[in-house]
UniProtKB/Swiss-Prot annotation:
Belongs to the eukaryotic ribosomal protein eL30 family. This is Large ribosomal subunit protein eL30B. InterPro entries: Ribosomal_eL30-like (IPR039109), Ribosomal_eL30-like_sf (IPR029064), Ribosomal_eL30_CS (IPR022991), Ribosomal_eL8/eL30/eS12/Gad45 (IPR004038). One of its GO terms (molecular function) is RNA binding. The gene is rpl3002. The keyword Glycoprotein does not apply. Residues 1-22 are annotated as: Disordered. The lineage of its organism: Eukaryota, Fungi, Dikarya, Ascomycota, Taphrinomycotina.
Amino acid sequence: MSAAPTTAPVAAVSKKGKKSGDTINSKLALTMKSGKYVLGYKSTLKTLRSGKAKLILIAANAPPLRKSELEYYAMLSRCSVHHYSGNNIDLGTACGKLFRVGVLAVIDAGDSDILAA
C-alpha cells in the first residue's frame, strides 16, 4: 500500500481587486493625458466649491478629517467620490508624477471614461 500524498486542488487566487485597480489606473493615465484635473487638497477644495469638479479621488492614507471634509463638499456640489485603494505614493505614480498625490479632482475626463467608474 503506497502512501502517496494527496493534495486538494488549490483554487486559483482571484485577482479581481487588482484588475479593478489596473482599470482605474489606465483610465487615470488617459485622463492625465487628455483631460483637465487638479492635484492637491487646496486646489481640489477650490474646484469643489466652484462646482467644476466631476470626480474626486482620495488616497487610502489621507487623514480622516480631510476625507470627511472632501466628502462633505463633494456631497454639496453633487460630485462623485472614489476612494483609491493605494496610498498617496501609489496615486502619484498612477498619475505619472514623481511626487505623492493625496487628492485629485477630475474637471474634464477628456477621452477617458473614468467618470463612469
